[in-house]
Amino acid sequence: MTRKSFLTVLALLLIAVSPFTLQAQKSVNLKYNVKAGDVYDYTITSDQDIVFEANSQTMAMDNSYAFYMTQAISEVTSDSIRIEGKISRTVTTASIFGMTVTYDSDDPVSAQNPMSAKMGEEFMKILNKPFSMSMDHQGNMGNMDLSQLSDNEELAKNLNSGSQFAVYPEGKISVGDSWEKEIIPVEGSDMKFEAKYTLLKVSGKSATIGIDGVVTANNVGGEEMRLDGTMKGEMIVDVDTGWLIESTLNQELDLDIEQNGAKFPATISGTTITKSTLKN
């Protein structure tokens, strides 16, 4: 190879790797920088495989659901953000014992099936009921008002599970940097989500963050249970606002539920995808 051709190849190589070099050196200061009046539409979909034991029998259930939700920024101060929201629709499908039941809150026909109607009764406790919460500009949750929802534990876990809001560190971070945060998804319980965040990529106006978390609990909603598991995945956020664009979380959970002195072991494997778009 001549000296000229060697220099040409070297130049092409440097051009090829330069975007990766620039990306590795890029740093960002992530925080929630939204305005009062901003409205975000959410779609949350999840597929779960549930295996549980009862009466010495092992049973399996496939469960998938979609929630459609709106969150509006009602107030922004120098140290807090107030969010008002509601869930407007759910589509849920459950398969067990060879039967498949689907409930769509926007389709009255789906509620004609007695089992679907029973599912609908439960979902009506949370659909179109307002809730509110506050957080600081780094994503640390403050007050959460779910009093209008008669069955709010699952919603609380979802809102505060790490699938919608990352907790950002103070100051600038670079690709490869990691930080940790302990999250309590349900107030008054000992459930904990210990999350490790890693900035994986910055591209244009979006940043990709890896999540590697451990979930533990011994008591949830007054029910004695042992829960251990992992939640891993990625979330893409807007660099300018810090707000979620899309997240994918994979869950692997083992739990024992205690009722009347009996234990019911179960395993849950699933993937939850959350997408958010600015409406206004």
Regions found by a protein language model. Give the residues of each.
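Structured extracytoplasmic
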Residues: 80, 94-100, 104-192, 217
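Bacterial Sec-dependent N-terminal signal peptides
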Residues: 1-30
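Acidic, serine/threonine-rich low-complexity disordered tracts
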Residues: 25-101, 174-280
